[in-house]
Amino acid sequence: MRILIVNDDGIKAPGIRKLAELSMQLGEVWVVAPKSQCSAMSQRITLFEDIEVTPESYDVDGVRAYSVGGTPADCVKVALEFLMPEKPDVIFSGINSGYNTGIDILYSGTVG
């Protein structure tokens, strides 16, 4: 199974590392996450600007990891259109460091 993992807390967030570690039991794992914190970005995408994509060394063996100088939605687009040779079977978003409940879901970068 091919798994794409994204988040809105950034490539260095502890939650995404734990999710990648646990997901390795299920198959091939790709982590494509924002270079920095991008909470409350919802479905925002970057237009009319270049997006920097950087391969990252990751402390979870076997994980392919990239940081993206853009939003969580940009991360998904970049992964699907440029990085992954085949579409993922599943996309996980998180693990979030804050709550995504009630009205917060409308602007959540994790949910967006």
Q: Predicted segments — roles?
A:
Residues 3, 17-82, 86-87:
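A cross-family phosphate/adenosyl-ligand binding-site feature
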Residues 5-12, 104:
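Short, glycine-rich nucleotide/cofactor-binding loops
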Residues 9, 37, 71-72, 96-99:
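Short glycine-rich anion-binding loops that position phosphate/pyrophosphate groups of nucleotides
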Residues 15-16, 106:
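Residues at alpha-helix caps and immediate loop-helix transition turns in enzyme cores, especially N-
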Residues 32-34, 93-96:
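Short beta-strand segments
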Residues 99-108:
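Glycine/threonine-rich flexible loop motifs
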Residues 110-112:
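Small-aliphatic-rich amphipathic alpha-helix that forms the alpha element of a beta-alpha
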